[in-house]
A protein has these predicted regions:
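Phosphate/dinucleotide-binding and metal-coordinating scaffold of catalytic cores
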Residues: 1-389
Length: 389
């Protein structure tokens, strides 16, 4: 299939479906990079983010390649350290005609499919719609720590196979017995065709997450999560068995002062709401120092008052989290992004969080549980119209 397709490309001179535009300072991805600050990846109500989302949906793809993770996996590594089968988490880097880049994660499971209860958190498939929903939830909570993410139907033949120069990526394309064009991750261990993703026959939906600035321009630190999960079937981490573990963390720099521990709590709340049970590390831009925000990518001592107030607002019938999320997600072309049971699950999880906070306040007092921060929270973006009417 690959050899025939290569000849077909050469015959038609299909090197690129469209000539790239010259690099423009006003390009949405560049303006997004320039707008990153100590407070978040983008300002509140940023028009740049909305423009970036539209561009990722509409612009022509001019190249496709494996991500750095997949490229690293193709090299030498200690196979005994790999827990999950290689090839399960397939993702590609797509470049658009304005030279912007996005991470493409294809659909692996249908929206209505639920993870079996017997699955371990480190063997589950990544869900493209979860990436989209996480961005919208992050924006509703006013964290602004998830890169802009949007859904798109990708023609895997024209927008990946015909524009990639990576021969390994070209070699993993095939036509299924149902005449659908499929491809899978190339890696040294368990790259079987049952992990393949397929178009219908060419179109495949997935999520596109905007790239952050390169590490050369904006260095980032990857820091182990103090509450990292165990990646074995029977082992436990210290925080799971030591009731005094949190007190120990609070005495260690940088969690002993500043906002770092409060940001960890924000991250834990976010992960609980989206059902993410696997956050082995978090990243921070080095430019903003120890009190910069935590990046919620592939997104103790107390809770910020602004976070608590926003969560309480989203528990009110007029601004119910599931309703705000439903309205926000309608903007995506792959809507409905979440099924109704998943939306209602957000309300249940929110109630569990507020119940836990109330229990802590009753036990220790509000002064020790709720930390005052300076910025007053705004109403969720999709609910502001209600506030002004």
């Amino acid at each position: 299939f690959s050899r025939r397709h290569k000849l077909y490309r050469e015959e038609l001179n299909l090197t690129s479906p469209a000539a790239p535009l010259p690099l423009r300072p006003e390009a949405s991805w560049l303006q997004f990079h320039l707008g990153i600050s100590r407070d978040g990846l983008y300002p509140r109500s940023s028009p740049t983010v909305n423009r970036l989302l539209r561009d990722m949906q509409d612009f022509t793809t001019i190249s496709a390649d494996y991500s750095q993770d997949e490229k690293a996996l193709l090299g030498a590594c200690d196979c005994s350290q790999i827990v999950k089968p290689s090839g399960v988490h397939l993702k590609l880097v797509l470049r658009f005609q304005d030279f912007g880049k996005a991470m493409f994660k294809p659909m692996r499971q249908k929206r209505e499919e639920e993870t079996p209860e017997d699955f371990f958190y480190f063997v589950d498939f990544q869900r493209h719609n979860a990436e989209i929903a996480a961005f919208h939830l992050d924006r509703i909570l006013d964290f602004r720590r998830v890169p802009p993410t949007v859904g798109r139907l990708i023609n895997v033949t024209k927008e990946i196979l015909e524009v990639t120069k990576n021969e390994i990526l070209q070699s993993v394309f095939f036509v299924s017995p149902a005449s659908n064009v499929c491809f899978f991750a190339k890696c040294p261990y368990m790259c079987k065709t049952e992990y393949a993703v397929c178009g219908n026959p060419h179109l495949l939906e997935g999520s596109l997450s905007a790239f952050l600035p390169s590490l050369n321009l904006a260095p980032r630190l990857s820091i182990p999560n103090p509450w990292i999960r165990s990646y074995s079937f029977d082992g436990k981490e210290e925080w799971e068995v030591n009731p005094l573990y949190c007190n120990t963390v609070r005495e260690i720099y940088p969690y002993s002062n500043g906002n770092r521990l409060l940001n960890i709590v924000d991250m834990a709340i976010f992960d609980f709401l989206i059902g993410n049970m696997d956050r082995p590390h978090y990243e921070m831009f080095t430019k903003f120092g120890d009190d910069g925000f935590l990046l919620h990518l592939d997104n103790a001592r107390g809770i910020k008052r602004t976070t608590l107030l926003r969560l309480q607002l989203l528990a009110e019938p007029e601004y119910r989290l599931s309703d705000v999320m439903r309205e926000s997600l309608l903007q995506d072309r792959l809507a409905p992004v979440l099924t109704e049971p998943h939306l209602l699950a957000l309300d249940r999880r929110l109630q569990l969080i507020l119940k836990a906070v109330r229990k802590c306040i009753d036990t220790y007092g509000e002064a020790k549980v709720v930390a005052n921060d300076t910025t007053q929270p705004e109403a969720p973006a999709s609910a502001r119209v209600k506030l002004t009417t």
